[in-house]
Design a protein with these regions (language model features):
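N-terminal beta-strand-loop-alpha-helix module at the start
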Residues: 1-70
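Short helix/loop capping segments that flank catalytic or ligand/cofactor-binding pockets
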Residues: 21-22, 40-42, 96, 242, ...
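A generic secondary-structure signal
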Residues: 59-62, 81-82, 102, 277, ...
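A charged, amphipathic alpha-helical module
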Residues: 158-290
């Protein structure tokens, strides 16, 4: 590796490094590469492909002559055209990191530390050495202190670190929902039109195949657009964010969520800037502390934590399968065929993924991931599905979220217990169950909720794996008291991979 290159050295920016904070100077020369093979290897959501290409091409248009923009089939074809040294911020996946370090012309490439996160890898490594259990809450509080966010001297603002207990209110019963203003929305332009035409042609020619439906672009693809989206969130939506952040409404897929994960994961927003902007909203009286703390926790806590866990546990982490779940994703799920589903929550949420490539974190965790965990689907396949089907999905995002959090495939390295529940949780936190053919209180019979029966089936299959987990003592004791367990298991096995 060459070291100490100047700001005149061309900066190679990947398609998730498109913001100004990935450059050392506003006028630094830039290399952008559009590689079609990235879309040939996997069946991505159509909206995800559009978003990535639109963002890359918009960045090239913004930079003009400052950028060398190469559109090739592979990255190597593009790099073969280079005759100058480049620098690059560390990529966000093991595969991309290995690739840039294996390019033959090593002396002409300088790999810089990663950007786009609030805590650097060296700092996390020091913290992890001192905190081997890797508890998120400890990491989050350390980040609050270190970054001086929501702190009054040495103490947290208003004397509280955590407003999770206040931010778990169920879905409102009012027909007006949350009564929150709409999120920011972009206007498409000629670049979007050309991206759509190119994707249509590639698919027509058989070069690529997509899942999901096309539609108007819904997320920011430039730093300017992303700042506009952030401004609308801080002004109109952040004040309402906290209390219902864990709730679901069938008629309101956005609720008060920011919808900033997609532009942030494209590198268009610096998460630390967003966190300080949210704190400013609290300090100026524009948003309550509970909502601001909940949002900042997602940025400097959860998002950074997921990033660091991905690297900390190594390349083999994505293949962990502690519960020995080997089931294949059924075709209806893999293809986002919500029409095959009758369970109201799963049907509606799968349709949202099909049509938009996005739902907020609770439908992801407590409906989609919960169902996959209960069915015993292979966690690597579930990870790949989330990566491909969500506009904000990337390798680093989904490996720890799925393997560690939602599928408990790491055996508890990250989460202390499996995140699974029966229909009662969905009934309490959403408005889905009232119009559903299934009853959340029933685990056997024609109207048995697939999540309720699935919950007990999951516990029965994995009782030995979970026997030494103290947090599972109560659920396993409940399992032993079930008189109709054999009937539950038989019914769930009959359902198998069929859509519920």
């Amino acid at each position: 590796m060459a070291g100490g290159m100047s700001v005149d050295t061309r900066r190679w920016c990947f398609a998730d490094q498109l913001g100004p904070h990935f450059l050392d100077a506003p006028d630094q020369p830039v290399l952008l590469i559009e590689s079609r093979s990235a879309f040939e290897r996997r069946r991505f959501h159509r909206r995800k492909a559009h978003l990535v290409l639109s963002a890359l091409r918009h960045r090239a248009a913004e930079l003009g002559d400052q950028a060398t923009f190469l559109q090739t089939r592979t990255y190597r074809e593009a790099l073969d055209q280079l005759d100058e040294p480049v620098s690059v911020c560390q990529p966000t996946s093991w595969a991309a990191d290995r690739f840039i370090r294996s390019i033959p012309r090593i002396p002409k490439i300088e790999v810089l530390p990663a950007r786009g996160f609030c805590t650097d890898r060296a700092t996390f490594a020091d913290w992890a050495e001192a905190h081997p259990t890797l508890k998120l809450e400890n990491f989050y509080r350390d980040a609050r202190r270190r970054l001086d966010l929501l702190m009054d001297g040495n103490q947290p603002a208003e004397g509280r670190w955590n407003f999770d207990a206040d931010n778990r209110e169920p879905a409102p019963t009012s027909s007006d929902g949350l009564g929150v203003g709409p999120p920011w929305r972009p206007d498409e332009d000629e670049i979007d039109e050309q991206v759509r035409a190119d994707l249509d042609r590639w698919e027509r020619d058989g070069d690529v195949s997509f899942v999901g439906r096309d539609g108007p672009r819904e997320f920011a693809v430039t730093a300017t657009e992303a700042q506009s989206a952030l401004k609308v969130f801080l002004r109109d939506r952040l004040p309402h964010f906290g209390p219902h952040e864990d709730a679901m409404l069938s008629g309101d897929r956005f609720m008060a969520h920011s919808l900033l994960s997609a532009p942030m994961n494209l590198g268009l927003l610096d998460p630390l800037d967003c966190a300080y902007a949210a704190e400013d909203a609290y300090r100026s009286g524009q948003a309550p502390l509970g909502s601001v703390e909940g949002y900042i926790r997602q940025l400097i806590g959860w998002r950074d934590y997921i990033w660091h866990v991905y690297w900390h546990f190594g390349r083999g982490y994505r293949r962990r399968n502690a519960l020995e779940a080997h089931g294949r994703l059924p075709k209806w799920f893999a293809d986002l065929d919500s029409d095959a589903v009758e369970a109201h929550c799963l049907k509606d949420i799968l349709a949202q993924v099909r049509d938009h490539g996005w739902v907020h974190h609770i439908p992801r965790l407590m409906v989609l991931s919960n169902y996959a965990l209960q069915r015993g689907w292979n966690p690597a396949a579930v990870t790949d599905w989330f990566h491909r089907c969500f506009v904000d999905g990337y390798e680093w995002v989904m490996v720890a979220n799925v393997v560690g959090m939602s599928q408990h495939a790491d055996g508890g390295l990250m989460a202390t217990k499996p995140y699974t529940s029966g229909g009662a949780y969905i009934n309490r936190m959403s408005d889905y169950c009232g119009e559903c053919k299934y009853r959340p209180s029933q685990r056997v019979g024609d109207r048995a909720c697939p999540f309720t029966g699935g919950y007990w089936w999951f516990l029965d299959r994995n009782a030995k794996h979970l026997a030494n987990n103290q947090r599972m003592n109560q659920p396993l004791a409940g399992l032993r008291r079930l008189r109709d367990l054999d009937d539950v298991v038989k019914q769930q096995r009959r359902l198998g991979g069929r859509a519920p």
